Amino acid sequence: MPSPAQDSAATMAGKNGHSLISTEKFRQLYHTLIASQLLNEQLRSAGKPAAIPHREAGPAGFVLDLRPEDIVLLPSPTHFAHRVKGTPLKPILAQPATASKTTLTRRLADAVAVSLNNKIEKNNAIVLTLFDLGGNAEASLSAYDEIFAIAVANQLPILFVLDSRASFADSLEFKETHAALPYITVDAYDIVAVYRVAQESIVRTRGGGGPALIELASCGGGEENPVDKMHRYLGTKGLPANKWRSEATRRFAKELQAACHLQSDPLA
């Protein structure tokens, strides 16, 4: 039986008034999602390390409102979420096709080290680390029990975000082992749901509530284009989805053109 800490996404989304999202924030979310998907496609077409198609909503929704001092640890230097955090396109596109990926063990250990330093310095910064288990249903979160135990024991300001493309074999056992670690599941293709969970999780962790693990899961009907999903949602709210989509596409095309021009300019 889940502990009270292992809350549902729906419950988390309704706390502390974060269920209300302004029209401007909806626009920003949609623009960010579209640009993330376009960048992901650009990276794949260039033969560079890229995220799995249609998995952009989770990282984008979590990273969007992080503060400059917050640290994001991503699988590769070409991950689209670097742009969401504020990295310009040029250095992302300039990464070689052989850009190395950090191992999961190293990334989780780095998250613990950085967040421990944040806690010691009392700088109010948090660490977000995005990881997956390689789409392998036999993969085990329990292989990293020690890292999660350290994070919980020290109430470290870390958000562990698991991009879960397949159910993993020991999820119930993991939750029982780490009963004090909030474990939240949210639809990986729904950026609005992700954003709401992100806001609650960030506020809780930044306020001294300790770490949390959020699973970006395929809920319900399986894989779906998150841009199309949000487009339909905006339509139900009477918001100008077509206009915003055109704006976002044009803006990213202009940004990409400028970045590519800078790359080809030896004086840039």
Predicted regions and their residues:
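Conserved acidic/glycine
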Residues: 1-57, 127-128, 138, 217-268
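Phosphate-binding glycine-rich loops and adjacent basic patches that engage nucleotide phosphates
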Residues: 2-8, 21-32, 104-111, 141-147, ...
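Short charge-dense sequence patches
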Residues: 8-22, 131-137, 151, 155-162, ...
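A generic structural signal for short, non-catalytic loop/turn and secondary-structure boundary residues
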Residues: 26-28, 65-67, 153, 207-209
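Cofactor-binding active-site loop characterized by glycine-rich and histidine/acidic residues
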Residues: 38-153, 173, 178-180
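Thiamine diphosphate
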Residues: 157-255, 267
